[in-house]
Amino acid sequence: MSVSGYKSDDEYSVIADKGEIGFIDYQNDGSSGCYNPFDEGPVVVSVPFPFKKEKPQSVTVGETSFDSFTVKNTMDEPVDLWTKIYASNPEDSFTLSILKPPSKDSDLKERQCFYETFTLEDRMLEPGDTLTIWVSCKPKDIGLHTTVVTVDWGSDRVERVVFLLAEDKISSSLTSNRPYSRSRRAPKKDFAVDDYVKGSRPSKVVERSFRNRLPLYEIPKEIREMIENKEFPDDLNEGLTARNYANYYKTLLIMEELQLEEDMRAYDMENVSMKRRGIYLSLEVPGLAERRPSLVHGDFIFVRHAYDDGTDHAYQGFVHRVEADEVHMKFASEFHQRHTAGSVYNVRFTYNRINTRRLYQAVDAAEMLDPNFLFPSLHSGKRMIKTKPFVPISPALNAEQICSIEMVLGCKGAPPYVIHGPPGTGKTMTLVEAIVQLYTTQRNARVLVCAPSNSAADHILEKLLCLEGVRIKDNEIFRLNAATRSYEEIKPEIIRFCFFDELIFKCPPLKALTRYKLVVSTYMSASLLNAEGVNRGHFTHILLDEAGQASEPENMIAVSNLCLTETVVVLAGDPRQLGPVIYSRDAESLGLGKSYLERLFECDYYCEGDENYVTKLVKNYRCHPEILDLPSKLFYDGELVASKEDTDSVLASLNFLPNKEFPMVFYGIQGCDEREGNNPSWFNRIEISKVIETIKRLTANDCVQEEDIGVITPYRQQVMKIKEVLDRLDMTEVKVGSVEQFQGQEKQVIIISTVRSTIKHNEFDRAYCLGFLSNPRRFNVAITRAISLLVIIGNPHIICKDMNWNKLLWRCVDNNAYQGCGLPEQEEFVEEPFKQEGSSNGPQYPPEAEWNNSGELNNGGANENGEWSDGWNNNGGTKEKNEWSDGWNSNGGGTKKKDEWSDGWDNNGGTNGINQEGSSNAPQDPQEAEWNDSGEVKNGGTKEKDVRSDGWNNNGGKNEKEECCDGWKDGGSGEEIKNGGKFETRGDFVAKEEDEWSDGWK
């Protein structure tokens, strides 16, 4: 490595003449860790502060640390040495000395004799002699400290780069004793489960018969083989049309399901033992506490004796309890009897297919819809909505919001109406006002409101309940939950609007469901309404909030099963924020990564802003104007209008801000990104310490409370370790999570920890869109969550590689709002418009699905164990621990057999159940006794004779005689699809631009 040009002796003799060094990536520097004396010249220079376990040594802030290096003359003649601190970062943080620096116990005389400097001049070293030189560092701040020491003799030079990581008590407490080691697993043995012995289900996981049973939708063998061979039906070559809609999306869903199966195989275990735990057998599953894989009460796995010669059966084991990394299961009684302490097994984890089957059914049922719901461009004539004035319940509505509500009240069926706009423009509040107006002014209105996650659905319900000026009757509003949702996680003010039995959420019987005027649900849980038998057209209005976050099949669960032509469908969202989470690159590239909302904007009526189809909200009531300025210019053509009042009240009280007039601050930190154990997720202890310090300084002022603060960070390990420290400090009200967990939410103060601090890994992430820093949609969401103050903590030399982050960095610098390490050179980027089409939440994959010799990921977006490098495992797109869009896990491969849960709607509403160990004295639903008295449907799921059990039909679930054996028919014509076309290899797909990816997060 060379960091400086040659200088004359005269120049070196001037102590004050020091050079400059920019950011040096310690992982790319070969001179700092060790040296080979055989590669050196006649003067051999050792390395001070050598790396330990391939990382810089740690030192304590405020204390002097020192180490020596030696210079040996191997020549036959003396040499004249000039040794110098060429440069340090931070400046003047390192010194040189001939004497060993004094320690804390040194006497006064020893301290007085010690002399340190930046340059040791004109030292004559005789042949064979060795000179010992001491390097000292006294760090004032946490972070990486770097210096370059040069040793010159004659015209030759040796450079040594020193890296030290200055830490405080918080960062030191997070030091891991588990070095990172990627699990290099041998190829798994073939593990067939076609023939298995059923296990013992938990007592509360019982079958529930529904009027409309969910078909199995087992993947046809020929379709599976086609896709695995990179072949596909002609429909995919043709593109999405009204004729091939169901077949097109079912093929994409098969691709996605096959990818999930493949990902789950990484979790399979071989040659493992189980322990007796009373009536259970327990299996230790590494990573289970971090939901890798995710298993809950009622799920099942398959095991087979490791040394089975093929004559024994596989055994199914149901999960009865999950404790940390240990899962307690029950198998068939014969398996428990045969088990011994020395028994060794191979284990296969299973992918719960319920959600995927719901998606298959939804796109099948979409063929029953009025075509104008799916393809408004085919609409024969332009519609005109007749509007009537209304009296707003909320006094804060602006003109655009009032206009959009009038349109919703005046709509008469297809096509859908869209309310879209940037963050903080009041989309959800507009929906809430529309719901209340329908409730109070239209006597026969029945409204279904769906959101992508439980927290988002709860948020809507809370808004409805606290709206002043109107009271919704308790018996006219209902919150539908999946049975797997934890009872304990729901707020008391919401639980009274839910239906449950023994702390298990259930879907009420049909008679009860149809009495409600307002039903709030997630997209996935809305499938229970169709299962219970709610007719098409029962709901006069179906409102989809945050519609851009869901895939089109998810949106179709509510729309395709419950709409008639006159049903009013309203979508609210922002296609420039986060979209659906997709794991199959092939499926994403062909359209599964595009939301229903985004696809509608391909129609002229929507993209041209026709007020009879769409309203755009542009007034932001959330953020300080200075916070809005950059995202408005980058993503919304400068149309955002800052409309928040009282923007400076918090800023005025924070004395530590470098610029009180500017609501942002960037703390430049050079830390080390690390991993531990077999977990591929990154964390940065130095940034964690700075996050905690910032939270303490904020809460020291009464104007900012813990609940006012949110911390956004892209890596699961960073989230967990920040929470660990906050728990220790009893500061549990601070919310910490990923960007996905904050979409649709806001906090007075947002702190962003970017984590990455090495160019080597960041460049790899950027190349394949795996990381947080290369994702414009994530960037957009992250920086628009803050109401009053945005704090960014990160390495400026890393984030400046991305155009959007670079602009944010220099905006802070230009407004005197930057503090911390030295800045990089300002980079110039070619301006590119934000691309709305082709969004994706899966990363761009490298070409080969393997790891190279250096231990770097070569493919898949997913790291070992099927997990993305951010640590958020790829099991269904979870947003929080209990934030599955319907409460379901999506954890693996494998399928259920036809004789098992044949209706598909197991455990009282399509769930596998939850861990029931919870509060036994929790408040009971006041309506529970009423539901029990009215009874539940016990036998409503009988199939018609002409309905196939596999579900592969093309007409909403009713098989017709002319349908081909696999259910794949050509747009309803009854003709079999010809197996044409070839999948291009992954390397042949045209890679999307970085700003098209809406998620890089696993």
Swiss-Prot record:
Q: What is the effect of changing K427A?
A: Loss of helicase activity
Biased composition regions of type Acidic residues, renumbered to the chain: 993-1002
List the SUPFAM superfamilies hit by this protein, alphabetically.
P-loop containing nucleoside triphosphate hydrolases
Q: Which reaction is the catalytic activity of this chain?
A: ATP + H2O = ADP + phosphate + H(+)
Chain segments carrying region Disordered? 831-1002
Keywords of the record? ATP-binding, Cytoplasm, Helicase, Hydrolase, Nucleotide-binding, RNA-mediated gene silencing
Query: One Pfam family for this entry, by name?
Result: MOV-10_beta-barrel
Q: Where is this region: GW-rich, involved in binding to AGO proteins?
A: 871-1001
- Please state what the protein is called: Probable RNA helicase SDE3
Q: Which organism is it from?
A: Arabidopsis thaliana (Mouse-ear cress)
Give the lineage.
Answer: Eukaryota, Viridiplantae, Streptophyta, Embryophyta, Tracheophyta
Name of the gene this protein is made from: SDE3
